[in-house]
């Protein structure tokens, strides 16, 4: 009995630290009238939100504001091969949807159109009224095939796929999305004064024009074995020229790679497919996190030295090489 009792109680020092932390949280919650709750697909219950109305800080639902928060700010890998590993197919799980009022501008969004080997579609069409995420710096458009072992594609980490003011637990076919979560912000109830002046202007709905002040660039890919253990991803330069992606990279790197291939006449010059592979010397992380500095320009000052071809190409020093078995000779 004595040893069993010892197992059920916290050590004295740990109990003191835990008690102190609990009191700090309670006092902080009392002092700050803006608690933040994160909703994932495992905690999404309307009844929980309704119960907040009966508590001290929230007197009406007008104080409850929903915000979509993107995952990319946490430093997750955003390249297509890495991102697709975070998504998986499941059967027998009903999808969940929640709306949100405001969101962030996303650096990386995705748009998938995947078919099974028999030609049938892997992903469902979006429900009526569901539109793509409206603010994307780069849209990674992926087409390809895969086993798709399940009815619907979910996020393995329990996150949402953010669309235009709508978050869903599943991926919809051909609809642009960003990865994220939904946060519910409880605002303090404003004091009402009968002499309060009317607004100087009516509020503006900034989501009407999804392209205003924001340049979107679409990057295209071909993927095989989507949803399987080992997938293969090719970056599409044009209809006959591709680059094999074998390690993490940034979208800025792909933009520069695309321009380098075109400027140096490295595109396929026939109807055959030319596939390039990256030289191991290349560092594909150029421009990492540059979007925190600015979101509205194309980073023109980034150095090209690591990607540019020399005037006289040495076969042993070139930074790109055609894949063995390619049936299309490159231009001289």
UniProtKB/Swiss-Prot annotation:
It comes from the Viruses. The gene is GP. Belongs to the filoviruses glycoprotein family. Residues 1-33 form the signal peptide. One of its GO terms (cellular component) is extracellular region. It comes from Reston ebolavirus (strain Reston-89). The keyword Signal applies. Disulfide bonds join 109-136, 122-148. This is Super small secreted glycoprotein. It is found in: Secreted. Glycans are attached at residues 41, 205, 229, 239, 258, 269. Keywords: Disulfide bond, Glycoprotein, Secreted, Signal.
């Amino acid at each position: 009995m004595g040893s069993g009792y010892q197992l059920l109680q916290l050590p004295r020092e740990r109990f003191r630290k835990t008690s102190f932390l609990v009191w700090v949280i309670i006092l902080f919650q009392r002092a700050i009238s803006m608690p933040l709750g994160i909703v994932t697909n495992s905690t999404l219950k309307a009844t929980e939100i309704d119960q907040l109305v009966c508590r001290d800080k929230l007197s009406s639902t007008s104080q409850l504001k929903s915000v979509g928060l993107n995952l990319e700010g946490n430093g997750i890998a955003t390249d297509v091969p890495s991102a697709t590993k975070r998504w998986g197919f499941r059967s027998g799980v009903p999808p969940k949807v929640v709306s949100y009022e405001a969101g962030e501008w996303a650096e990386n969004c995705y748009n998938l159109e995947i078919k099974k080997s028999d030609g049938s579609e892997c992903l469902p069409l979006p429900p009526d009224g569901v539109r793509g995420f409206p603010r994307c710096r780069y849209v990674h458009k992926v087409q390809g095939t895969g086993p798709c072992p399940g009815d619907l594609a979910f996020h393995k980490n329990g996150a949402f796929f953010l669309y235009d003011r709508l978050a869903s637990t599943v991926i919809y076919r051909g609809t642009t999305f960003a990865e994220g979560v939904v946060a519910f912000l409880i605002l303090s109830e404003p004091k009402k004064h009968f002499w309060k002046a009317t607004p100087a202007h009516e509020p503006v709905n900034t989501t009407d024009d999804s392209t205003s002040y924001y340049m979107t660039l679409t990057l295209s890919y071909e993927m095989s074995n989507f949803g399987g253990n080992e997938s293969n991803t090719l970056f599409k330069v044009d209809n006959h020229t591709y680059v094999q992606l074998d390690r993490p990279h940034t979208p800025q790197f792909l933009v520069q790679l695309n321009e380098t291939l075109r400027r140096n006449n490295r595109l396929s010059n026939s109807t055959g497919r030319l596939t390039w592979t990256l030289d191991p010397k290349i560092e594909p992380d150029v421009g990492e996190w540059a979007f925190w500095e600015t979101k509205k320009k194309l980073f023109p000052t980034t150095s090209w030295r690591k990607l540019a071809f020399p005037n006289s190409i040495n076969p042993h020093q070139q930074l790109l090489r055609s894949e063995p078995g390619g049936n299309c000779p490159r231009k001289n």
